[in-house]
Amino acid sequence: MTGLDTAFNYNGFASHRTLARIAPDLLPDFDLSTKVGYFPDGHDLDPQRLREAVEQSAEDLGRIPDTVLLHNPECSPGGLSPACAALSQMRDQGLCRAWGITTWDPRPLRHATRDIPCPDVVMIRTGLTVPGSALDAAEEFTERVKPLHRWGMAPFAGNTTDPLWTTVDTALFLAPGQQATAVQAGIATAFTLPAVSQLAVGTSSLDHLAELASGARLETNAKTMTRYRVLLRQTATVGERDTGERNSSAASHG
């Protein structure tokens, strides 16, 4: 593990100061990414507020962030273009080394990407917990904005105790001959669903962190992963058809 990912608003807007206080000697050794876009009064992509947040982040951390990500711009899609231009300018001015976009659900951004500069990074949800429509939208979004790197996040949607991890045989997604826990298999699939070069995960346990790191070394079964995507799309299509039929029936009897 060589990276740390945080955000301006994490830990009650105190995450940067907390990191600087508990690990001042270690921070320079990590590739540090943070996010801006949330403020005490809510989500805002105003360029001046974003600049102030980035400047405050560097001051609180005692160093400039390696990467600054625009935090969930789907909450304010109309502000995406000027916000991206502002972060790109901040990178060029030395307030960070790279900039990018992190989005939990890129579907609202489909028609908001026309005028934005190409980001260095896009971070998206990956893995078995992501709905098929969100996976397709994430791939479409990265195709449109053409980042240099694509990172993943939230492979367990914040809950490793979800019944999914005990009721589904996640070993089916791995190449044959590998032994793994469900969590490790979840990590492996998150690196390939869709393909990402880095994966951000949250943990408060060293044992859990070691388990997650082991999962990153596993190889997935390409045929199974492809079949899974096909099934996701078929399921979505059936769901849309059923919804349409119910709506048509309701309209005809209204």
Predicted regions and their residues:
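N-terminal binding-site loop/beta-alpha segment at the start of enzyme catalytic domains
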Residues: 1-30
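Hydrophobic beta-strand scaffold residues
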Residues: 3, 32, 148-150
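Glycine-centered flexible beta-alpha turn that most often forms the glycine-rich phosphate-binding loop
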Residues: 4, 65, 99
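Beta/alpha (TIM)-barrel catalytic core signal, keyed to glycine-rich beta->alpha loops juxtaposed to Asp/Glu
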Residues: 9-12, 72-254
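Acidic (Asp/Glu)-rich catalytic clusters
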Residues: 19-31, 55-63, 89-91, 112-117, ...
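A short, structured active-site edge motif that brings together acidic residues
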Residues: 28-41, 70-71
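Glycine/small-residue-rich loop that forms an oxyanion/phosphate-binding "nest" at active or ligand-binding sites
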Residues: 43-56
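Active-site groove signature of glycoside hydrolases
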Residues: 58-77
